[in-house]
Amino acid sequence: VMQYWMAQRVACDTLAAYIVSVNWSRTFISDALKACAEQNGVEQVISYVYANELVTKPGSDECTGLIQGPGQRERILTGPDKVKMCEAIASKSAYDTSVYVGDSTTDIPCLLWADMGILIGSGDQVRDMLHQAGMDSVLHTIDSWKQLDVMQQRASIVCASDWYAVCDLLQLQ
């Protein structure tokens, strides 16, 4: 569902989609997305994957155990590193609204940074960390988020159970 929705918007030039990851390599993510798109008969719509890459020995597929950042950039290791990457992407974007979808604790800074931060899935660890920081009030169900004014929405994280809910939420925009 999300792939079809995104493909339509990318084709109409109303959406650019990126992935920023601390845990997975760019090659792994790109290959998984390509296989998924082929399996579902849709175009791969992610504009670019920003993730660390495993360093291999020259002329070999053998990994050295080191990682390097995307392109010539610093490695992405923490939530603040993800925010720096998102800020760099947004500064070059033709779009004026940033939406960030995440599910882990390293996503918290980006969920709070984005114009629209969407916590997908149960997000138990994210919820626990926000609770420990006394920030429970930033989390909203989709229904309660809809009742907020624009400034309050931008200072909030909206919780979506799955990609269907994310798709429905984004169609409101």
Identify what each model region corresponds to.
Residues 1-173:
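C-terminal cap/substrate-recognition subdomain and adjoining C-terminal extension
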